[in-house]
């Protein structure tokens, strides 16, 4: 199975993904049964250590690229992540990074902010054009908007 299929199967079993925003949250996460995490903390000097720790505990790890200082938001930044840090994938608001991530074998999750009807329309167009592996819809508590995307 490939990374995307593994992730989707896991998501079907455990519908929660933790959002780790500080090193303290990292330790708290490891005490839970949740299997997947979005990592929004760290920097280029510690991020591999964080990812390795999570993977040692058999967790699925996605890096929010824009939240990791020192990682460039381009093809070379994604190559670095894929070759040296080795997360399961990335989360990004930047559509340009989705294809780069997929080319490097990373699962690519597009984060969309659905704040008004224009954002919904633009988000749907982006998803059709870019074809990310999965979507994170923000704000998180918007069930009526989910029907429009699905």
Predicted features and spans:
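Conserved N-terminal beta1-alpha1 strand-loop-helix module at the mouth
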Residues: 1-63, 69-71, 86-87
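Short, acidic/polar
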Residues: 18-30, 74-78, 118-128
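Structural motif
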Residues: 32, 84-85, 104, 129-130
């Amino acid at each position: 199975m490939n990374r995307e299929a593994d992730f989707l199967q896991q998501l079907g079993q455990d519908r929660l993904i933790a959002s780790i925003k500080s090193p303290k949250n990292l330790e708290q996460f490891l005490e839970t049964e949740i299997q997947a995490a979005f990592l929004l903390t760290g920097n280029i000097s510690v991020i591999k250590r964080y990812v390795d720790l999570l993977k040692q505990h058999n967790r699925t790890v996605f890096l929010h690229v824009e939240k990791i200082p020192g990682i460039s938001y381009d093809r070379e930044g994604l190559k670095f992540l894929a070759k040296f840090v080795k997360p399961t994938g990335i989360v990004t608001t930047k559509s340009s990074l989705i294809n780069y991530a997929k080319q490097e074998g990373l699962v690519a999750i597009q984060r969309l902010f659905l704040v008004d009807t224009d954002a919904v329309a633009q988000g749907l167009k982006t998803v059709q054009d870019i074809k990310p592996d999965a979507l994170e819809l923000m704000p998180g508590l918007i069930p009526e908007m989910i029907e429009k995307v699905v």
